Amino acid sequence: VTEPTLAELADFAGLHARAQGLDPGSVASALARIKAGGDPAAWPRTWSELGDRQLAEGRPLQACRYFVLARFPYPADDVRAAAGRSAVAAFDTWRRRQGGIERREFALPSGDVAAWTANLHEGNPVLLVMGGIISVKEQWAPFLTSARRLRAGVLVTEMPSVGENTAPYGKGSDELIPEILDALGARVCAAGVHVVGLSFAGHLALSSARHDPRISSIHTVGAPVSGVFGDPAALPATTTSTLAHLSGGADLSGMALTRDDLARVRVPVRYVASRRDEIIPRREWELLAEHVADFEWVEFDDVHGSPGHLADTRLWLLRNVLARLGDRRATVLGLLLALRGRTGRGGLTRVAP
């Protein structure tokens, strides 16, 4: 497997840095120092130093965000692994100060899984948030702090073999979400479970929804469906090396979803697509439009994750989450999106049963 270049790492990490709200000047300065040296070891060291500085200045959440970049894209060496542990510790410090956020640990058949939760009580719908193959759960603090305003219970966790999740990534990974719901219990899940699964986590959610009626809706950005698993050589080195790390180099072609698989997904699926996506080709979301019973998507003229449209992506996803929760604020967000006028084209399909 080809390792990603520093230039490619910088491009992908830029999206994660912007999504976490890190200071653009600090990020640009750090990237310039890393590139100038040309030493791959400078990557985790530079970001870890920034994290340590934030921690010393009493800003644990900001420190966590820099540590997340230090482990990027996965803990391939001791420094990155240490940064991953530092990210968890810094987040834990922050959430204890913040209040209202709990740590949950699950010993599941698939493996050990950790999660952060907020407002997770019987009677509340559950919003299960899972990042992609690079994203750790500590990146999703805004979902946790918004739990009460969303009037939902929020659980943020990680994909198999990402962060603290010890489950292997591969053909049986679609059991992870059902196993988490089993651990939560029927009463907690009774008001519905809405999955926000980014990128490859969106694929897991689609795969799980084929056979788990507890999943009420799926909201995703740039989720793969089929072709990506059959032609890994066409993917960027960051993606292929990360997938190889998570899967132990196993063949992932069996994870591709067929047309029959997609037809079995009977819950609403909401999808943000990027027209210039270097990971997810257009055909992936076209398959969803052709075969998923209730599918709505929006397109941005952007690369993977639509980093140039973060505000619109968040508004569009939030509007759809609120709509599934029966919250009238969804209408207001829809009007705001229309006024912004940046959502580009998209569509809505209703496949006959």
Descriptions of predicted regions:
Residues 147-164:
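Conserved alpha/beta-hydrolase
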Residues 289-307:
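Catalytic histidine neighborhood in serine/cysteine hydrolases
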Residues 143, 267, 280-290, 301:
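Short alpha-helix in the alpha/beta-hydrolase fold that links the catalytic acid
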Residues 265-266, 271-273, 277:
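Short beta-strand/loop motif that positions the catalytic acidic residue
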Residues 47, 76-120:
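N-terminal cap/lid segment of alpha/beta-hydrolase-fold proteins
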Residues 139, 167-188, 194-195, 206-207:
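Alpha/beta-hydrolase active-site loop
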Residues 74, 302-314, 332-334:
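Catalytic histidine-centered segment of alpha/beta-hydrolase-like enzymes
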Residues 204-253, 267:
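Hydrolase active-site cap/lid region
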